[in-house]
């Protein structure tokens, strides 16, 4: 490398020709280099001639483009050096590893690798130290906002937000609150970081005794139209089997207004099998069409008579006050299911029992 630096140094021609490099005249060095270049050019010329001769023997006549390609290929072979040979793995004898003889494996003796902690340091404290260290960076700033405190009752981690200012706590008038703070201090002693966890240091907030205010709850009354026959119905507010129907006044239309030949004039649609009222002691007080209606709606004869008298009692009192009698009024007056009361309203309306001409005599 020193020879090349001396040979290519920017010195004038006269010192280069007269001087010497490593005690060898520079002119001899230049002649040696020129001789190498001439030999290389001769090799290139021989390669070109060989390629042209081989092409003439194979193709006969050679075109100019073929000559140019042959010259380019020879020059490329001269200028582009061939890559170095890949290293070869020499043959060496394979040495087998020595086998341990008469060694019995005992699985009962196991080696347990555990992390080495400093005195007083565990995994929880290590995680706490790491979070405090990372919280100094803006990217991990939110890692210190919550604390994980074990709950002794269910042994689960409970996330509790740290309270900084006690004045920001909500004021409750009827309850006394006691707030406990858990303080954790991190300090560094003699270059070794350690953590000091205080026991549950409870700080009680001064409690203000406040006289509780009694709140009177107002009962919400349902908005509904009162019964026009409320004064009369108060004497018999509930249905009493075989008794209540006799205590109610009877404003029902006469039974002769119903045809005797048609027992299905009051028939309505109802799901379920009809009730057998052939042995009811009060069936003689019902028209045959009414008996069919009571069987379909599964109403005993005394309950049917009670509902019928309450039905027309409300109709008469509303007629006296000049109020219309609607389906909802019938449902409120009867002490039976609202769907059955609606079927009674439909049946009585179908035969004309709700017409005002039947009740004009009570005005």
Curated annotation (Swiss-Prot):
Gene3D superfamilies: Winged helix-like DNA-binding domain superfamily/Winged helix DNA-binding domain. It holds the Pfam family SWIRM. GO terms for biological process: ascospore formation; chromatin remodeling; regulation of transcription by RNA polymerase II. Residues 1-22, 186-208 are annotated as: Disordered. Keywords: Stress response. SUPFAM superfamilies: Homeodomain-like. GO terms for molecular function: chromatin binding; transcription coactivator activity. Induction: By heat stress. GO terms for cellular component: nucleus; Rpd3L-Expanded complex. PROSITE patterns: SWIRM. InterPro entries: Homeodomain-like_sf (IPR009057), SWIRM (IPR007526), WH-like_DNA-bd_sf (IPR036388). Residues 266-363 form the SWIRM domain. Residues 186-196 have a biased composition (Basic and acidic residues). It comes from the Eukaryota. This is SWIRM domain-containing protein YOR338W. It comes from Saccharomyces cerevisiae (strain ATCC 204508 / S288c) (Baker's yeast).
